[in-house]
């Protein structure tokens, strides 16, 4: 078993690109010194606060189902602005909004089936 460990250690040293061997004591000293030179706010913000919804507390199947749920939700952005707006599908509706005494308002196309069909008529 010790021969296996020695060969593994020697192969890891060979892969380390001829860097000097670091001991555990040296690495802990450098970590401690970098944490001492930070501001208090940086230290607090960089720490990971474990909550019930952390990814390492949940099983993998739950994490993947949550990711799939986020991908299936469609994000709606702004509207397309055209001088001539058209209905693109049977679900599209023409709506006139922001009308007052001095202005006729804007014509909008809204579509509950496909949010990409949202349009607003440009200035004339």
Curated annotation (Swiss-Prot):
Pfam families: Ribosomal_L36 (PF00444)
Principal subcellular localization: mitochondrion
InterPro entries in the cross-refs: Ribosomal_bL36 (IPR000473), Ribosomal_bL36_sp (IPR035977), Ribosomal_LSU_bL36 (IPR052010)
Subcellular location: Mitochondrion
Gene Ontology CC terms: mitochondrion; ribonucleoprotein complex; ribosome
Entry keyword set: Mitochondrion, Ribonucleoprotein, Ribosomal protein
Molecular function terms from GO: structural constituent of ribosome
Protein family: Belongs to the bacterial ribosomal protein bL36 family.
Job description of the protein: Component of the mitochondrial ribosome (mitoribosome), a dedicated translation machinery responsible for the synthesis of mitochondrial genome-encoded proteins, including at least some of the essential transmembrane subunits of the mitochondrial respiratory chain. The mitoribosomes are attached to the mitochondrial inner membrane and translation products are cotranslationally integrated into the membrane.
Protein name: Large ribosomal subunit protein bL36m
